[in-house]
């Protein structure tokens, strides 16, 4: 089973059920493959705040793809080489941090899409192999197959969200609620369900809906997933690798003590 059997764009177009994916911070292709076989729909590799480097990510993307799931990559920064590199390695989607203006969103799309939508540099034979396509077929379909999300996580991004959402070639908006809540509270704290955070997220979701974009967010827990889903979010990260390990170990110890 290979990645080309999973049409991420078509799946995200069906917004009746949320697309839930795990979030990886640890560099392990073995663990990535195992997570991809859990009853969730995708795996995101965090190259911004995780400990995953690009050389790690290549094998991890392959492991996720071989399990028939889409590999999503949060790149380190909004830089053409980093975005193109992730897509060349076979990522089905990239999440780009700190996109704070229309101009930055346009630059992101140029990095992620081939002409006429952008100016992505050609190359990356791993992507052809991942999708099981000839180079010619990949070129024809890459702009549609690969998804690019702009992260909304600052006051500046929120102020410009309607302009960002209208950028041609953008596939979705992805809220970083921790950074956004820090920004909105002026550094007081992190609260992913505070009123000011949720009000801001409603604005982001409305901008996404107006432009037929996917609304995504880092949720983390079942309760927060339900809250965000009620506001129109359908692309959400829920299971973090470190949290899964801690929960599994804690459950085992508790079970032993309860016997």
Q: Which functions belong to the PLM regions below?
A:
Residues 1-259:
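Expand to "…catalyze enediolate/carbanion chemistry for C-C bond making/breaking, isomerization
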